[in-house]
A protein has these predicted regions:
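Generic recognition of flexible, low-complexity loop/linker segments
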Residues: 4-9, 15-16, 41-42, 101-104, ...
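Internal maturation/activation junctions in enzymes
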Residues: 71-99, 103, 107, 122-179, ...
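Structured loops at beta-to-helix junctions and adjacent beta-edge loops in soluble globular domains
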Residues: 20-22, 31-32, 55-57, 177, ...
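Catalytic alpha/beta core of large soluble enzyme barrels
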Residues: 86-88, 174-325, 329-336
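Contiguous, well-ordered alpha-helical segments that form the cores/surfaces of helical PPI scaffolds
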Residues: 56, 106-121, 171, 181-184
């Protein structure tokens, strides 16, 4: 029996998503380039289009800056950038909506980078109770200092119309953005709030290829007379991992676990801890094993939602060193 379809009629209009933007973190939605950001939670309406000024604090230097006015100064700086944006867009074509939002809300987003590097500098395992305590202390301090700074700005320069009576200059002050490029430039520290993908890898950037060796692991290996080519090649072949090394103690191995070796539920728990202090969101990535069952992934996402995490960013499955290790250990002439 043969059936011939003569005509297809759509009874409603549907959204079309064309995922065709190469080498960018964007996609087309109904002809509009959309950024898949998860740190920004601001509104857009017919008359306003959100804008937000972002910058990140290097947590590797947290002990040096936590008792200074560095955080407050960063809030002052970002607010002045917002003022400059408002001034420069006056009368500019097609900028009425974002300028109006900037005037009414002056939204800022102070974030962080170098979280895993900070823990490793103190020889703290990502999964440890001490890490959880540091996590809470850092973001509680960040919240208090940002609130103090925006209150001072409101007292000096006044409150936007939308915030009249709230004693605030800015609708938001904290947003944890992804910092893959900036963290690498800023001393090759770990990106944002996530663990390092690998202890040893080659990063291919526009300016060239750069080799990354975990500086805190390097220091440890030097103390054991193991900082040599043979050791690092062994680490590379094992996907940037040190979990196989008999020369390291269990405590030392725990400190240098990579992204995929840390239980992802632990990453969600830390995100939930800090979310209470973040008025916007956090760029939260998860490293899911390729063999993970859909049910397990679903349970992890539900756990994140139930824990108070506002959203998730990327779901990854392999790190750069693992990919390179595969190419090293694979005979290309043996492939079919």
């Amino acid at each position: 029996m043969a059936i011939t379809i003569k005509k297809i009629t759509l009874d409603k209009e549907v959204d079309v998503f064309d995922i065709t933007v190469p080498e960018t973190e964007t996609f087309f939605a109904n002809g509009i380039a959309v950024h898949n950001c998860n740190e920004i939670y601001l509104s857009t309406c017919k008359d306003e289009s959100f804008v937000c000024n972002l910058s990140s604090i290097n947590l590797e230097r947290w002990d040096d800056l936590k008792d200074t006015d560095a955080i407050e100064t960063l809030v002052y700086f970002l607010d002045s950038v917002m003022t400059e944006f408002i001034d420069k867009t006056e009368g500019m074509a097609h900028m009425d909506a974002p300028r109006r939002f900037a005037i009414n809300q002056r939204a800022l987003g102070v974030g962080v980078l170098g979280w895993h590097s900070y823990l490793q500098s103190k020889s703290l395992a990502f999964e440890s109770m001490q890490a959880k305590m540091e996590n809470i202390d850092i973001f509680k301090t960040l919240r208090e200092k940002c609130d103090s700074a925006t209150a001072q700005l409101a007292q000096i320069y006044g409150e936007p119309e939308l915030l009249k009576g709230y004693a605030r200059r800015n609708a938001t002050t904290i947003a944890v953005a992804p910092t893959t490029s900036s963290s690498f430039i800023l001393g090759q520290v770990s990106p944002s709030i996530e663990p390092l993908n690998s202890n040893y890898f080659v990063k291919d950037l526009a300016k060239g290829k750069f080799t990354y060796k975990n500086p805190y692991l390097t220091k440890l290996l030097k103390s054991k007379a193991l900082d040599n080519t043979e050791t690092w090649r062994d680490i590379l072949i094992h996907g940037g991992s040190v979990q196989h090394m008999t020369a390291l103690s269990d405590e030392e191995k725990a400190v240098f676990k990579t992204f995929g070796e840390i239980p992802q539920k632990e990453i969600v728990i830390q995100a939930a801890q800090r979310q209470r202090y973040i008025d916007q969101g956090q760029s939260l990535n998860l490293m899911i094993a390729p063999k993970a069952k859909p049910k397990e992934v679903n349970e992890l996402m539900i756990f994140a939602w139930e824990s108070g995490v506002k959203g998730l960013y990327y779901q990854r499955s392999a790190n750069p060193a693992q990919e390179l290790a595969r190419s090293i250990m694979t005979c290309s002439t043996c492939e079919a």
